[in-house]
Amino acid sequence: MKRVYLDNGSTSFPKAPGVSDAVKNFMDNVGTNVNRGGYEEAYAAEDIIIETREKLCKLFHFDKLRNVIFTPSITYSLNYIIKGYLRPGDHVLVSSMEHNAMMRPLQQVKQLGVEFDRIPCTRDGELMVDKIEEMIRPNTKAIMMLHASNVCGTVMPLQEVGDICHKHNLKFIVDAAQTAGSFPINIEQMHIDVLAFTGHKSLLGPQGIGGFLVSDEVAHEMIPLVTGGTGSVSDSEFQPEFMPDKFESGTQNIPGIYGLRAALCYLEETGIENIHAHEMELCKAFIEKID
């Protein structure tokens, strides 16, 4: 019997061609750390990490290579952003469709004095964009929202919300867990200040690798939640302030980054627009068949 996998909202399967080979190649033939040694294999692994950052910049139309931060998952990314950027007295707006990766950290910082309000949605799950401006307060710092819901499939109008953020000088923080790799996302055009992603869903990479792309202004204000060894300025006991070291302490998931790079190569070759069109065709066919 042929297996039909329908759980891609949780994690993609199968992964992109070449992903498992890339992970295995690192584990079997490379196996080094980065920024900790001055020999050929370590430099080669560092080159792969840099190339992966470059591919993420290209995919999301972002021009700050050093501001691409790797984390273990998008949940970690959102925790870093929410707990590192928001301060007591700040107010943020979120949609009423948010995942717990957003809401649980927000509920934690609420206990410390951060406030948030939920932008309502219609009964069909569409964001009520016309309500946003009347909800903005003098202390509103950002609008934070997912791009798409893995519960009902709602896709948020990022361009419209980004335009409102730009108009009111608010930061725009986007959870792209469900859409990075299957929807075109343009950070510059959409006025996105922070884009959080995971590697194992529509990016078609392995589990255990995620990250975020962050503007200089937000990165400067953020406090690193995890500090430690970075392989840089090791004679100092204080965390580096330069990027990406400010937010990348400890050993990276280098096998995961190797796998993610392979997935990004596949996405480049196939084209995000082609992938998106194919997914929309599949969605239409599914709806027609069950109607």
Could you say what each language-model-derived stretch is?
Residues M1-D291:
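Pyridoxal 5′-phosphate
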